[in-house]
Amino acid sequence: LSDAPRDPFAALPPDAAELAVRWAEAAFLPEVDAELRAIHGDMASATAAHGPVCDASGRCCRFGEWGHLLYVTGLEAAWCLRAAARTPTAAEVRAAAARDDCPFLESGRCGVHAFRPVGCRAYFCDPRAAGWQEALSERMLARLRALHESHGIPYRYGEWRTMLAHFAA
C-alpha cells in the first residue's frame, strides 16, 4: 500500500508527546470511557443486525496482505492502550510497519479484540458487509469526533501504527 508508513515515527508531528499525554489523560476520564463503551456497544448492535460472518482468521490485522489501512483517532489509540494495559515498544511498532500488520496481532489473532478501535469493529472480510459497513463507520466516527469536541480533546485521525507511535516514542 502506497500510504502505509515505512517508519511510523517519521510521520509524528512536533507536538506528538503533548498530544499523547492529553489523549492518555482523557482516556482515563470515567465519562469518556463510558461514551466510548456506548459507541462500541451501539456499533455492536448495529453490526449484529446485519449478521456479518467473522471467521477469526486475523486477516483484518494483516493490512498489506488485504489491501487496507486502519485509521483511528488519538483518543481511540490511548483508550485501547489503557484498556489493554500494554503499549507496544518503538521496536514493535516499527516491526509491525515493516510486516505491514498490526502490532497487536498475536498468533494470528487480535490481541486487543475487546478494546479494538471503531475501524476494526467496522471491517469484515465478509463481502456482504460492503453494503453497510462504510455508512456505519462514518456514523460512529462522527460520534467520536463529537466526543473529542465535547471534552476539549485534541482531534487527530491517522494511520494506526503512526498513532501508536505517539505513545511508544
Annotated model-derived regions:
Residues 1-169:
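Short loop/turn segments that flank or connect secondary-structure elements
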